[in-house]
């Protein structure tokens, strides 16, 4: 049996799909989410085999959410929507399948069988996903979309992944690995990514370490492993 997460801003649509999947006897719904941010968090927490995802949702669309998933660990994604004009883009972005609302039981059964066959293969090849020009973050009971060009750096700690601009700090459900692959942020430390355009100066420290100072005055550590590469990116050879 496969595990599934349902992401749709319409509760009735989620409940109806959950009933259909339960009737199939092959899919266990382990969670539901009403928006993309909540959905991304539950994908990381629950690690479902498949996500049934609506496309048109507030703030962040289903297609945008797909581009935020780590291609090495992402579940299969089945879009469930009332609009057929997104089908081509969905498949170009590596969606597993595309179902139209109201969901036809026979069509859903075919999708479930394909999912079961795919799961048996256990062949999840890396996929190329679109780059991100903004980072979805949460804070103070709101969703914040931070443009990449405003981000100075991002780092991980016990609380999760934090994104720092000149004026504010916010928390993101995206991993540093995804941010490194999907944005212009570059690795400078095992726990830090930095926007090269935000660097004002680099202080060389002892033992081959360094510290970057951003235009806003924030300090960002640089490990020996990444110092040489960073200097080359900035034109120092």
Swiss-Prot record:
<dbReference type="GO" id="GO:0005829">
    <property type="term" value="C:cytosol"/>
</dbReference>
<dbReference type="GO" id="GO:0006355">
    <property type="term" value="P:regulation of DNA-templated transcription"/>
</dbReference>
<protein>
    <recommendedName>
        <fullName>Uncharacterized response regulatory protein VC_0693</fullName>
    </recommendedName>
</protein>
<keyword id="KW-0238">DNA-binding</keyword>
<dbReference type="InterPro" id="IPR001789">
    <property type="entry name" value="Sig_transdc_resp-reg_receiver"/>
</dbReference>
<dbReference type="Pfam" id="PF04397">
    <property type="entry name" value="LytTR"/>
</dbReference>
<feature type="modified residue" description="4-aspartylphosphate">
    <location>
        <position position="54"/>
    </location>
</feature>
<keyword id="KW-0804">Transcription</keyword>
<dbReference type="GO" id="GO:0000156">
    <property type="term" value="F:phosphorelay response regulator activity"/>
</dbReference>
<dbReference type="InterPro" id="IPR011006">
    <property type="entry name" value="CheY-like_superfamily"/>
</dbReference>
<dbReference type="GO" id="GO:0000976">
    <property type="term" value="F:transcription cis-regulatory region binding"/>
</dbReference>
<dbReference type="InterPro" id="IPR046947">
    <property type="entry name" value="LytR-like"/>
</dbReference>
<keyword id="KW-0902">Two-component regulatory system</keyword>
<dbReference type="GO" id="GO:0032993">
    <property type="term" value="C:protein-DNA complex"/>
</dbReference>
<keyword id="KW-0597">Phosphoprotein</keyword>
<feature type="domain" description="HTH LytTR-type">
    <location>
        <begin position="135"/>
        <end position="236"/>
    </location>
</feature>
<keyword id="KW-0805">Transcription regulation</keyword>
<feature type="domain" description="Response regulatory">
    <location>
        <begin position="3"/>
        <end position="116"/>
    </location>
</feature>
<dbReference type="Pfam" id="PF00072">
    <property type="entry name" value="Response_reg"/>
</dbReference>
<dbReference type="InterPro" id="IPR007492">
    <property type="entry name" value="LytTR_DNA-bd_dom"/>
</dbReference>
């Amino acid at each position: 049996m496969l595990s599934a997460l349902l992401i749709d801003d319409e509760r009735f649509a989620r409940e109806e799909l959950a009933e259909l999947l339960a009737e199939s006897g092959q899919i266990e719904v382990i969670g539901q989410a009403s928006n993309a941010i909540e959905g991304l968090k539950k994908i990381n927490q629950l690690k479902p085999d498949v996500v049934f995802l609506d496309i048109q949702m507030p703030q962040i669309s289903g297609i945008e959410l797909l581009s935020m998933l780590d291609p090495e660990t992402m579940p299969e994604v089945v879009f469930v929507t009332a609009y057929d004009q997104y089908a081509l883009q969905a498949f170009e972005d590596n969606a597993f399948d595309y179902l139209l609302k109201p969901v036809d039981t026979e069509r859903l059964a075919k999708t479930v069988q394909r999912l079961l066959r795919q799961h048996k293969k256990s062949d999840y090849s890396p996929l190329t996903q679109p780059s991100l020009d903004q980072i979805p973050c949460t804070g103070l009971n709101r969703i914040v979309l931070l443009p990449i060009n405003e981000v100075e750096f991002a780092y991980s700690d016990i609380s999760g992944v934090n994104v720092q601009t000149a004026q504010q700090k916010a928390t993101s459900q995206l991993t540093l690995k995804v941010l490194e692959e999907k944005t212009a942020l570059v690795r400078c430390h095992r726990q830090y990514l930095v926007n090269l355009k935000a660097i004002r100066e680099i202080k060389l420290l002892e033992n081959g370490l360094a510290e970057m100072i951003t235009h806003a005055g924030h300090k960002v550590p640089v490990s020996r492993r990444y110092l040489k590469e960073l200097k080359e990116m900035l034109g120092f050879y």
